[in-house]
Amino acid sequence: MPLLRRRVHTERLIPQTTPARVVPVVPRQVQQPAERPRVIWRFSDGKAGHDSQSLGLVDALKRRTRIECYDIPVRPGAGLDWMLGRFPAGSLLPDPWLAIGAGHSTHLPLLSARRARGGKTAVLMSPDLPKSLFDLCVIPEHDRPGPAENILVTCGSLNRMQPVYETGSNRGLLMVGGPSRHYRWDNHRVAKQISRVIRYSPVRDWILTTSRRTPPGFAEHIRQMIFNRNLSLTVLSWRDTTDQWLALQLSRSCCTWVTEDSVSMIYEALTAGVPVGLLSLSPRRRDRIVNGVQALVASRNVMRFSDWSTGHPLPRPRRVFDEANRVASSICGEWGSE
């Protein structure tokens, strides 16, 4: 039998493969660590007007960068802490990027904190200590500070208010102060002006709020004076209001009237941008506070009761009062990269 030879085709012994599929390599995205919040130590003497200023600046800084704010009540012994280079009140807190204080009793604690833990210091209002000791002094123009690289002049004091756009409401706000070093308080004079404002203004719905300085019984006296079924008057003591109450009321008001002694409340209303009328008082003397209020009248940013009573409508502020945001922008621009 003949030997049959099979021809072996070697190409069939190699397994057939399909061309390799090329899968594009997507670079792995590396998640960037979140920016660490900047630490603020806010020193407080417990006075509402001073807290309003420092909180206003903290609020404005939070609108620009991540912030962790720690409130530190001031206590005696700050001078000794400064001399010894220590600051026990902040021993459990992270190092500050910025320390803020308003009020004379916060000045030495600010310096003690910086010496012990570093960071920058910002003092609000003119300090008793030399201004050169602080990294930043935020001083109202009515204090007439001299020019210096670490001084930022503002139009009035800082506060927590934000601009209010016209709401079309028919509600008015009355803010009453009390006896002060700068003005002679007169219960009868203020009550008479309030009565005429409520009776002759086109506004029908009113809220009146007092302050710590308002004489006892004054608000109740106003309530008894005003009796008109076509009017609504709500009287609230300052004890019955919260931190954000004033901002809410200003946002709902078409106008506000403030006693002339209440400079902080005047600037809060101006910052909100609502028309502001002044319930007039007699100044004790011509000092920086009185001159500052007179400058607001002369610039037609506010109107005294005597001018309004002749038929002139309350004007909206002629300029924008946005000082907390302006100071915050300056701080972030100067120290934001540190």
Please provide the spans of the model-predicted regions.
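Active-site donor-nucleotide binding/catalytic segment of nucleotide-sugar enzymes
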Residues: 41-43, 157-217, 237-238
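Extreme N-terminal starter segment of soluble prokaryotic enzymes
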Residues: 36-40
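Active-site and donor-binding regions of nucleotide-sugar-utilizing enzymes
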Residues: 42-156
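Short, charged/polar "capping" segments at the starts of alpha-helices
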Residues: 48-52, 79, 131, 145-146, ...
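A donor-sugar binding/catalytic signature common to diverse glycosyltransferases
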Residues: 247-287
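Leloir-type glycosyltransferase catalytic cores
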Residues: 199, 293-338
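Donor nucleotide-activated moiety binding/catalytic core segment of transferases
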Residues: 223, 227-264
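A nucleotide-sugar donor-handling region in carbohydrate enzymes
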Residues: 131-188, 305, 309-317
